[in-house]
């Protein structure tokens, strides 16, 4: 009779350990997949992320926003000419060089507006180069060996009794569900960043039209700061992901499985919070408003 109970006990333990291993394998697999997904998504340029959206944004910018930017240039250049002429002793000390300077500013303003997309895409090409370099350094050191991690836990699982294994099954199931929710939030953050980039690029001719004016130029300067901040945000996201993966990799070796499971959940929440804050941090670095 006792041998039958022992056999049933071992059978139940095997089922529970199998469920725990399945949950842990899914969680660690999700970590590896999410690290790779974030690196791939952040490293894409606006052209590479979705060609159809990029084409639509470019057409809107060239056909709708550029004419408005032309009106802005006209106003800015007229204001600039009036200011340049009148500031010299009410037109008594007018120098012909002023007109040369005005024509040069007009040329630069028109050039910037007509080449807006080339300039904005150059910013994100540079950002892609930085992110790709970071992904090469970070990605090679953060991949978790799922098989090795599970093998290291097997002895500890076999020593546990059924109640503790049941508790661990519930914990791993709960944390696995939380990981799925966090994964959705991370996807929302990444897609939200790209949509913000497209929206930012769509109106780029207007701030570029103001850059040659001393007073209005702050609009264009702040726009450029924001543009660089959006590009640099990808690098900050890669740093957050790298730190997260290293923390998870060290957590796998923890002796207490219960604390390790909830540490994984805590690290994932911290990752989401860090990704949310990466945009504000990038803007503060570039002093963009």
Which functions belong to the PLM regions below?
Residues 1-72, 88-97, 107-178, 217, ...:
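Gly/Ser-rich, low-complexity
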Residues 81-94, 183-187, 215-216:
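Membrane-water interface regions at transmembrane-helix termini and the short interhelical loops
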Residues 75, 120-123, 127, 185-188, ...:
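Membrane-embedded alpha-helices of multi-pass transport/permease systems
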Residues 175, 179-211, 225-246:
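Alpha-helical transmembrane segments of helical membrane proteins, especially in multi-pass transport
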Residues 65, 69-79, 103-107, 111, ...:
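Residue-level signal for the membrane-embedded core of alpha-helical transmembrane segments
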